[in-house]
């Protein structure tokens, strides 16, 4: 049964390579398949963390001089020299690995350490989305220590349905961009991402198996879809977008019901991060995919939850 499931996923993601031209979903499925019989305990998270630290330090050094990038500043697109936001995405992955490693021993000193390093990385990279995401993650973990907070239905269902909420927000904000002034203000804060979402929704139809989309800046005409949810919907297609939301919702509900609140905080943080980045399908950058793999194997093998906090 499990083999048939992954075989279908592999065939489906191979089809997506031809229909949309992106390989992220395929390699993520390969990673999930490789997780068979691998117990993602603290030891494995520790190994992943320290290997990641080495590569992150090397990446920071190689990117020390920055590179030319196009950014939306004061209502217009401008060229500027800055360090890549991918560095912050990679740092976020390291933070998640660290939190998963110490999920049972996550004291205030370790959390304070995360906050301090987060600020230092922000000074080096300058990604507002990244620094806010880590702060949100830390705040969520601290709030989840309260039984009363965890038992609030609005919190539980807000977390469980966060992927769907973020998907709906991305679509509605893109469609209604020209109708509401507050969306234009929010667009400037998000460096033109909502305007780009609006442009892509106008330019492309939604297809079941996705399509190739143009991204580039030829003749000063800048096109860049920097939203994971619209990238799934437009590029990977309606089937994939629905599948992602359904599985993500089920996963967060499972973690919440089993009191695995560090994992819930990580999953919700990534769900929100996807509003302004497209790396959710990248198994090298999205560490929550380890949790997807764990959940799928538990469901198919009908084994008990290995960790209850």
Identify what each model region corresponds to.
Residues 1-181, 202, 220-307:
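Hydrophobic transmembrane helix bundles of membrane-integrated enzymes that assemble
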Residues 182-186:
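Alpha-helical transmembrane signal-anchor/signal-peptide segments
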